[in-house]
């Protein structure tokens, strides 16, 4: 494999051999710029750097191909797709997040990608099977709609309501089942041999570490026709370290997220 040569046999992306090799790192620790109306996009508690999304899109697609985000939030995936000349469709229940995405496009002088304000379980019916070349999404967290940070009164909103009338374990089970339903339907819109990447962070809550990434990976592995291929760790250098348990107990500072990679068979 020539280090700086693009192979015509490359059916996945536009990367050279050396770029492909670098993209296989299981940890992303690149410092991404705080730009593209970051303050405005930060109204959403789970926004991702558009350049990070662009880097992932470059790994799993070629220019001009189509990307789907069934939980678009404020449009990190869509902005990333625009940066690298891909087409994208984003779906979200919350019109506020879509409005923020559109305002960012206006302020940045970028053409808007297609957005749909609806339940993904309904909106996905609009598209034929095998329409998309890549799915990139950041799933809404279980129990994160109005979660107060420890020792901090700042409240961040996610894209999914709490299951407030159920017990904690019941609500987590419902969350996992809902994620499976939506992403299972999304996968049907993905071309065979193509990939889905899912952001998911773990959580420390009520003095317990919740390995949501592992639980979600196991649940998504139940979807017929896809195979898990990797777990990429994104280390976010912008996250602050904390001393929540000091001096009595160890409590981790959550400065990473997992990116679960699946391929449609």
Spans of features found by a protein language model:
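Class I S-adenosyl-L-methionine-dependent methyltransferase catalytic core
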Residues: 1-265
């Amino acid at each position: 494999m020539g280090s700086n040569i693009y192979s015509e046999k490359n059916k996945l992306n536009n990367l050279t051999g050396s770029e492909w090799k670098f993209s296989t790192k299981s940890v992303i620790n690149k410092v991404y710029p705080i730009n593209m109306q970051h303050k405005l996009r930060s109204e959403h508690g789970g926004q991702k750097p558009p350049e990070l999304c662009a880097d992932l899109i470059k790994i799993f697609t070629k220019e001009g191909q189509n990307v789907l985000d069934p939980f678009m939030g404020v449009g990190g995936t869509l902005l990333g797709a625009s940066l690298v000349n891909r087409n994208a469709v984003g779906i979200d229940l919350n019109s506020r997040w879509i409005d923020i995405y559109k305002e960012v496009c206006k302020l940045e002088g970028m053409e808007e990608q297609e957005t749909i304000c609806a339940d993904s379980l309904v909106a996905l019916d609009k598209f034929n099977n095998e329409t998309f070349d890549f799915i990139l999404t950041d799933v809404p967290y279980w129990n994160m709609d109005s979660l107060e940070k420890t020792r901090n009164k700042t409240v961040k909103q996610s894209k999914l309501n709490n299951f407030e009338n159920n017990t904690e374990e019941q609500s987590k089970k419902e969350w996992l089942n809902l994620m499976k339903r939506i992403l299972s339907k999304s996968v049907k819109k993905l071309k065979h041999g193509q990939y889905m990447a899912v952001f998911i962070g773990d959580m420390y809550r009520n003095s317990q570490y919740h390995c949501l990434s592992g639980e979600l990976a196991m649940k998504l592995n139940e979807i017929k026709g896809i195979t898990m291929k990797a777990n990429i760790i994104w280390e976010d250098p912008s996250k602050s370290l904390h001393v929540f348990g000091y001096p009595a107990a160890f409590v981790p500072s959550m400065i990473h997220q997992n990116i679960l990679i699946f391929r449609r068979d």
